[in-house]
């Protein structure tokens, strides 16, 4: 297997591979003529991701790899997006439930670019997710920060569908700062984010953090890079 994505870098490479393998196996087992069941592929890929991450995995990457386009994952059904399906997972902390949506983007969003900066630091998702789970167990009041990230993400989805790039960038900055406060950033990520922000609308770590990559939203990709 070869990939142009950085591994263990928060870019969803393992989810893309899981979804592709599930789709290939389903195609092999089927008649090869009918359309593949995207929800079932996403379900199987999510289970595979969870098995590799100590029973904890968001369906965001596997749903995006399966559906393509822009995907919104929420703890509720969002009126501003097209609902696709519900995913549940039994985790060490109890059952989790997510609502998966597709989002239509306005043409104005095409004016912006995403610049990816790699730290070169490998950070297994399972390790970082377990770290945050441990923090929340020791300090339950930190769930307020998780809830705030959820609120900002919902606001970001609204800004995205409205094509408000400035608002999206501002929200990215705020979410990154909250994630850093939860201990999932690292010096290398902070250096990349600081370097990108002067020429971008916003920048944040991507994936579980601890290394991997950061994303910068910019209308000047050459300057940001």
Task: Give a label for each model feature.
Residues 1-9, 36, 40, 44-47:
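Glycine- and acidic-rich phosphate- and metal-coordinating loops
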